[in-house]
């Protein structure tokens, strides 16, 4: 009697695919019992009752064959999702404003370095550096504050005191606004600058905007509007303001944009002072207290 331990095809485990043994199902031998056993095996394979048959059908399925390769199973987990079209457009096409600002900054740094011919004693115009530093002192806030206070104390006319008091107000406003903007922006001074400036404060380590440029524009506009000067003197005042701003770049103290914005800020500061002009009519208490000194 044949052993009931058979494969799915009904062959004995020890038989080869090309040989047949008498009495086996291939030769029709073995009686009806072996035929019924083979028929029941086939039925169990079709119904999925046998776990071995279930594994065989799963291994023959197309899904299992596709997943049997490790690369095919790993690919869906490794491939990152493609970015949305709008995100890719933002990365590849930066805004026009950003490109313009970066280009302006690059030109500003390049031009400031080219114009810094007096930044050190070994620079191209290093011999002119003492003269530039003297011009630097002429635009410093301390000499202007002390000079305005001295003239205010020596003045004996109401009109002169009114002009000088508003000049003092303008200088204090300039110092306050420049200090606030420098503290907010915190732009470092150029790398080729030497920190040998006259009477510096904590905010003076920052360069934007140029306090000398704001003061030069403010004082020049103030003088031209409230002092009667001959034409050569008026030209000299404008020339002083321009050369003072240029000297800030030549000494390496500031970049070109620091000075340009400083001129604009100083020009607008005078508009504020002119709008808030102090006079005996709007602030009589201030002038009365000053006259009692």
UniProtKB/Swiss-Prot annotation:
Keyword terms, alphabetized: Endoplasmic reticulum, Hydrolase, Immunity, Innate immunity, Lipid metabolism, Membrane, Nucleus, Phosphoprotein, Transmembrane, Transmembrane helix
One GO CC term on file: endoplasmic reticulum membrane
Top-level lineage group: Eukaryota
Short name of any one Pfam family annotated for the protein: PAP2
Region of interest called Phosphatase sequence motif II, as start-end residue ranges on this chain: 209-212
Chain ranges passing through the membrane: 133-153, 163-183, 227-247, 270-290
Residues covered by region (Disordered): 1-34
EC numbers: 3.1.3.-, 3.6.1.-, 3.6.1.68
Site label Stabilizes the active site histidine for nucleophilic attack, positions: 258
Catalytic residues in the record: 212 (proton donors), 254 (nucleophile)
Segments on the Cytoplasmic face: 1-132, 184-226, 291-293
Biased composition (Low complexity): 10-25
Biological role: Magnesium-independent polyisoprenoid diphosphatase that catalyzes the sequential dephosphorylation of presqualene, farnesyl, geranyl and geranylgeranyl diphosphates. Functions in the innate immune response through the dephosphorylation of presqualene diphosphate which acts as a potent inhibitor of the signaling pathways contributing to polymorphonuclear neutrophils activation. May regulate the biosynthesis of cholesterol and related sterols by dephosphorylating presqualene and farnesyl diphosphate, two key intermediates in this biosynthetic pathway.
Family label: Belongs to the PA-phosphatase related phosphoesterase family.
Descriptive protein name: Polyisoprenoid diphosphate/phosphate phosphohydrolase PLPP6
The organism's taxonomic lineage, starting at the top: Eukaryota, Metazoa, Chordata, Craniata, Vertebrata
């Amino acid at each position: 009697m044949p052993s009931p331990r058979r494969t799915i095809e009904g062959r004995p485990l020890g038989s080869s695919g090309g040989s047949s043994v008498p009495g086996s199902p291939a030769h029709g031998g073995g009686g009806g019992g072996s035929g019924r056993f083979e028929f029941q095996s086939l039925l169990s394979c079709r119904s999925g009752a046998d776990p071995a048959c279930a594994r065989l059908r799963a291994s023959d399925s197309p899904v299992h064959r596709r997943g049997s390769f490790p690369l095919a199973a790993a690919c869906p987990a490794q491939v990152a999702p493609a970015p949305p079209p709008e995100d890719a457009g933002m990365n590849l096409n930066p805004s026009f404003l950003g490109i313009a600002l970066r280009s302006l900054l690059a030109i500003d740094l390049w031009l400031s370095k080219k114009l810094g011919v007096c930044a050190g004693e070994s620079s191209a115009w290093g011999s002119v550096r003492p003269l530039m530093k003297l011009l630097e002192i002429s635009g410093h806030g301390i000499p202007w504050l002390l000079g305005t206070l001295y003239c205010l104390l020596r003045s004996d006319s109401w009109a002169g005191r009114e002009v000088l008091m508003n000049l003092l107000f303008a200088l204090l406003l300039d110092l306050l606004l420049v200090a606030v903007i420098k503290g907010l922006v915190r732009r470092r001074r150029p790398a080729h600058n030497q920190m040998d400036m006259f009477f510096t404060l904590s905010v003076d380590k920052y360069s934007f905007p140029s306090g000398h440029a704001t003061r030069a524009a403010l004082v020049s506009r103030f003088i031209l509007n409230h002092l009667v000067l001959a034409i050569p003197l008026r030209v000299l005042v404008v020339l002083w303001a321009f050369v003072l701003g240029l000297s800030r770049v030549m000494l390496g103290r500031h970049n070109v944009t620091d000075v340009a914005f400083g001129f604009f800020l100083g020009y607008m500061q005078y508009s504020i002072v002119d709008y808030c002009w102090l006079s005996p009519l709007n602030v009589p208490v201030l002038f009365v207290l000053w006259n009692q000194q």
